């Protein structure tokens, strides 16, 4: 995301903090509901120590807050820069491995959270078949397996993100909304940033052009016009001779 002004940075931070709070509230509410249901209908859950029960609330609140913040950032960028942003990346022409990497980067956090939840469920099912362990021991085993798999997935996501950035072409054609006609899509060649903020000037130019359009001003000075930028400056030699 490209934030060009301090006001946009503040607005983005407010939006992110609000989404974090909402996600933590929703996730914690679901965790508390699961806690209450488990205490009422499961004798094994009631025998668990308080630390394991509280981990259910903390884990669900943290995971939901991350997902909410990620979705809020994408929504903020789409609302603020929708007319300059990409509409269709047209990944059909890319090889299958690059399409898979692109899909993983777009849905990274839901995949990680889903992997943790599915591993936790499968581990609980496998541990429940052992008749010699107690319920707390089964839950601890399931949590260890789930955490181990989640750590492996996190490390793999870092590697895949680095690999996707390395395989991304330096220039690709995307479709963007025509500022003069919002119902029309035009082809645009997007260049890859070699370092963060390299193409920041393009966003600034687009914003300035949009401001000039709202004021009904020309985007460029007419050729041969006399203005502050076209006023000739006297040469040093002529001023000295005078």
UniProtKB/Swiss-Prot annotation:
Q: Does the keyword DNA repair apply?
A: no
The record's subcellular location field reads: Mitochondrion; Membrane
The residue ranges crossing the membrane are 18-38, 48-68, 108-128, 144-164
Q: Which Pfam families match?
A: HIG_1_N
Highest taxon above the source species: Eukaryota
Q: Where is the composition biased (Polar residues)?
A: 227-242
Q: What residues does the HIG1 domain cover?
A: 80-172
Annotated region described as Disordered, given as residue ranges: 215-242
A GO cellular component annotation here is: respiratory chain complex
PROSITE patterns attached here?
Answer: HIG1
Record InterPro entries: Hypoxia_induced_domain, Rcf2
GO BP term (any one): proton transmembrane transport
Q: Which residues form a coiled coil?
A: none
Q: Which UniProt keywords apply?
A: Membrane, Mitochondrion, Transmembrane, Transmembrane helix
Q: How does the entry describe its membrane topology? A: Multi-pass membrane protein
How it assembles, according to the record, is: Associates with the respiratory chain complex III/complex IV supercomplex.
Its job: Cytochrome c oxidase subunit which plays a role in assembly of respiratory supercomplexes.
What PANTHER family does the record tag this protein with?
RESPIRATORY SUPERCOMPLEX FACTOR 2, MITOCHONDRIAL (PTHR28018:SF3)
Name of the molecule in the record: Respiratory supercomplex factor 2 homolog C1565.01
Which gene holds the coding sequence for this protein?
rcf2
